Curated annotation (Swiss-Prot):
It comes from Homo sapiens. Regulated by guanine nucleotide exchange factors (GEFs) which promote the exchange of bound GDP for free GTP. Regulated by GTPase activating proteins (GAPs) which increase the GTP hydrolysis activity. Inhibited by GDP dissociation inhibitors (GDIs). This is Ras-related protein Rab-36. One of its GO terms (molecular function) is GTP binding. Pfam families: Ras (PF00071). Its main location: Golgi. The keyword Aminoacyl-tRNA synthetase does not apply. Ubiquitously present in all tissues examined.
Amino acid sequence: MRSSLTPLGPPVSRDRVIASFPKWYTPEACLQLREHFHGQVSAACQRRNTGTVGLKLSKVVVVGDLYVGKTSLIHRFCKNVFDRDYKATIGVDFEIERFEIAGIPYSLQIWDTAGQEKFKCIASAYYRGAQVIITAFDLTDVQTLEHTRQWLEDALRENEAGSCFIFLVGTKKDLLSGAACEQAEADAVHLAREMQAEYWSVSAKTGENVKAFFSRVAALAFEQSVLQDLERQSSARLQVGNGDLIQMEGSPPETQESKRPSSLGCC
């Protein structure tokens, strides 16, 4: 099936156009070391053979303790603002960001979940169906890093095993420097490996690494979506081409008599 999808609404902004595969933050804890899109994905994009990928919203869930800066991170990327007046998220909120990846329209639905214990039962209902789970912590507070284990466990419980990309993100990078930053990142990289997650350090205040991080998230999710769609197309072709007859609604059922070959000889 060839795709003739066009973006819904106005063209995406230039900083949402991804032509090449975004690089990882550190090779010591990354989900994909390749520097290019998967060959099948590149070929499908060139042929515009990406099925319905351009019409779907891929769900991204951001979890973590109160005050780690989840909302600030999302607002810096989606609105390019940094609000110094903190307001806790009540329940859940979300933003939709549109991209153009390898010439194909693609959208992320980014869910901002509350960090307060009293909202956990509400937020957990929105973990389901996530393609990406971002576990955020404060680089200046080691306790928030330790808590990411539980946040990730809660989010994974609502999704099928192996179905989600996992990112561990250290926020407030602008508040650390030198040896303190190196130690905090080393601890985080160690945990990211345990989680089978990709690690990033960012600053919502300065914007450092924020765009690069979300571009990486979008590219990995897009690549997976295209590969899954190609697999579905392949499975559909196999089912149609396996030699079985397709019974049309209203047509008479086939009998053993009708299956016999007709004799066309003279009597």
